[in-house]
């Protein structure tokens, strides 16, 4: 049985979502049609935090969500995480803090030189600081739950979030780039339907 663990980016990230629909609701409805065709062959999971987050973006909640998307929290008490992952996380955080400080120092220097554009400099500081500290890292408990659940059930993460995919790779977890997910579902549906025809 193939098990996919779904991230919000499939339904919320406009670049990914457009393959399924123009709005999060359309994207979910299209996805659920795939889930229906693959029912019994493929399972789709979401940790409760991600499920709740996705529901917040939907105009109406299709009842099929309850049928085709399994809500499961990871068993956080029994999952073992290799020590090297914690070491890497600490080193990564240290590098990011240093990088964030350099971004802040640069903004201060610019504001001293150009006192007329302090608001623009602060906006730029916030954007660059956020990028320095958050890009490429698991930055929420929901993201971490996604990774832990995939590890627990030996599932395949589907996400466009660079931080999630980076840490999934470091932990030896299978993943699919959300940008290619619809094509993968098309292939799976085709395979399932051809198997039915042969029987």
Swiss-Prot record:
One of the record's GO molecular function terms: ribonuclease P activity
Top-rank EC class of the record's enzyme: hydrolase
One Gene Ontology term from the biological process aspect of the record: tRNA 5'-leader removal
Matches recorded under SUPFAM superfamilies: PIN domain-like
Origin superkingdom: Archaea
Keywords noted in UniProt: Endonuclease, Hydrolase, Nuclease, tRNA processing
Record CDD domains: PIN_VapC-like
Function noted in UniProt: RNA-free RNase P that catalyzes the removal of the 5'-leader sequence from pre-tRNA to produce the mature 5'-terminus.
Protein name: RNA-free ribonuclease P
Origin species: Pyrococcus furiosus (strain ATCC 43587 / DSM 3638 / JCM 8422 / Vc1)
Lineage: Archaea, Methanobacteriati, Methanobacteriota, Thermococci, Thermococcales
